Amino acid sequence: MNTSKKPMLSFWQIWNMSFGFLGIQYGFGLQQANLSPIFRYLGADESKLAVLWLAGPVTGLLIQPIIGAISDGTWTRFGRRKPFFLIGALTGSVAVLLMPYSSALWMAVGLFWILDASMNTAMEPYRAMVGDKLNDKQRTLGFSVQTFMIAGGQIAAGFMPLLLLSLGVSDDTQGGKHIPNIVKYSFVIGVVAMLVSMAWTNFTTDEYPPDNLEEFRAEQAAKGGFFGKIGHAFKDIWEAVIDMPQGLRRIWWVKLFTWYGLPFMWQYLSLSIARHSFNAPTPDSPNFAEGASYGGIAFIVMNVTTVVMAFLLPSIVKAIGTRMTYAVLLVCGGIGFISMLLTTNITLVLSCMIGVGIAWSAIITIPFIMTTSIVPQKRIGVYMGLLNAFICIPQIFNNLTVGFYYDTLLKGDPRNALVLCGICFILAAVCCLFIPKTVEPKYITEIDEQEENLQGDFAAVK
């Protein structure tokens, strides 16, 4: 359906179509706050954590562009995007359930690969559905609601271990060799969250069929069966890369620095807090479990800030545009990370996460607003997948290189890794200034043109 013909949806319709994101992000939040401690409990060396995190970017790089391209060319009685997030949520819930019960490092790593493949299968269709169902004026709101869901899910995930601890659930790690029950039960609750939220979106949201359904089905039949669609998906991806708008190519440089830095946060934030604020550098230290759980609190602070920013972002974007919003908010995140070097006080460390949350709200929203403003409607899925590739490639580079300099350049200190993340954010903000104006949503460029015309008319009168 042409974007100009798409009806205005109510807030609750937009809410319902994104509600499944809540459960998916609860799963991601559990992973981000607990995976490094889980790996450490199972015997992983701190300097090798980056390699163990490879599953996320590799599965994202391989799966999201393919799912985007296939779903662009799919229509079933269940819809275009819904079959994919149904499959992803169901398989992901199994991995979430089994992950904390891993008895060996190889088992946890294997389940991590399954979990991230499932999450990536589910996540891209949610992003693409905003482009499918919302017109230009409502897309900023649509992605802001998804930002709220991302933050809400991750807040719940970060808070859950401490809530369970307050209810009397054990945090005993048996000398640093056992995953505590507060982590295990948090993951079990995550399964329920994923399935319930996914079912809600599935039953409350319909998708628009292709404009000419018979012609669309004929085109799909010509592509053959499943393997034929896979082949055409790779062809569509390659053509999309060749035809990629200049604005999207410039976004790549912002993503390069942002997402080279971000893995440091997931890999080392909990460990940095345990080491510097709780004097617990290793899993057998007395306060390690408590310190690592405060990593979850740090993510709560970040995501509460992101929730607040979700309500403010549409107004900020309207006032200064997407490019400047992106740059300013990234600088806030960079300052937050770098400031952690100045204190070991847990309250001040958590306060630094406010700046990170401000930046995170832009990272998970602004690029998608830009992309849907400049790519063809019928190729939104494949370009959303390619946008995720922009995320994955820097992460893979991070995971493969950190081990070479963690003990030398970063002096084996997880806090120094967070400072490097902050520097990357500042460099990404500089790159924002080189993104062309064509990425601005149409309603913003229309406002700018009207203001320029008014200024011209005023000058003529003078």
Model-found features: residue ranges?
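Intracellular loop-helix junctions on the cytosolic face of multi-pass helical membrane proteins
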Residues: M1-F11, S103-G110, T121-A122, Y126, ...
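C-terminal ends and interior cores of transmembrane alpha-helices
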Residues: L86-A104, V331-T344
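C-terminal transmembrane helical hairpin of 12-TM major facilitator-type secondary transporters
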Residues: V317-P367
